[in-house]
Curated annotation (Swiss-Prot):
GO terms for molecular function: G protein-coupled receptor activity; olfactory receptor activity. It is found in: Cell membrane. Belongs to the G-protein coupled receptor 1 family. The lineage of its organism: Eukaryota, Metazoa, Chordata, Craniata, Vertebrata. Glycans are attached at residues 5, 167. This is Olfactory receptor 1174.
Amino acid sequence: MKMENHTLISEFFLLDLSDDPKLQPFLFGLFLSMYLVTMLGNLLIILAVSSNSQLHNPMYFFLSNLSFVDICFISTTVPKMLVNMQSQTKDISYIECLTQVYFFNTFVGMDDVLLTLMAYDCFVAICNPLKYTIIMNPRVCTLLVLMFWIIMFCISLIHVLLMNELNFSRGTKIPHFFCELAQVLKVSNSDTHINNIFMYVLSSLLGVIPMTGILMSYSQIVSSLLRMSSTVSKYKAFSTCGSHLCVVCLFYGSVIGVYFSSSVVLSTQRIMVASLMYTVISPMLNPFIYSLRNKDVKVALGELFIRVAPCPSWINDIITKFILKNIRQNL
């Protein structure tokens, strides 16, 4: 097969989620709805945290950052997927592909980091409550998040620069619905040894280190809970981190359950399903998990709704009673 330099390649071709044309309208409507729900849910979390001074603490700072990352994460892949569902060619330009690789790796890395920082925040809140304000200093938290953003941007830039040196054949089809780095490397005509080493080393570090940090944090949390004599104290302590634990299980469970299954060779369909779980499903459910299990977030959302939405007085009265009820329960 004739090889062409990457500078001559103008586009790649992506796969559909389904080969059945009759399913395309249904899938388009489904993923468009999921995308809009994700955008709205995460935007509400950001607005609720930023508009309520009671939520200006490290835990909700990390939560608002996670919501921002989830908005960017799903916006990296789903809009192009929706466009291709309405297109006959299913193509993506070379520049668009590089852009997807860059931002996808950045945001998935930040998801890992933020979940780890939130686990550590829970650990400090439960195991060292008297030192919480000292350890989880707002300035330190801000610098930590900023530092990891810079690190992820640099790592993704290296991925893209290495990928930019590869050769591809004209009409190359990527076996995925978006440009995932591992799948792009598989279809290159060049030697991808260096690319693969860098990718697997970084993937291992970004997988093992955050997961180890989360497991260590929760092992200490469980140990502290077992030493508590009061049932009420145990419930309050667990409710502090219950939402985060659900999100961690959803994010890592979808990856571990599919990518690290007993199958030696993963089919293209399994890879796409795995990607949908943590690129679409997880960002969509995160706001619901945090708002349904967290009284502070529910109160903040209620107050935001009263200020923004022009509602009849009887609806505002119901929301106000709900807010007061949750405030009394938190006392």
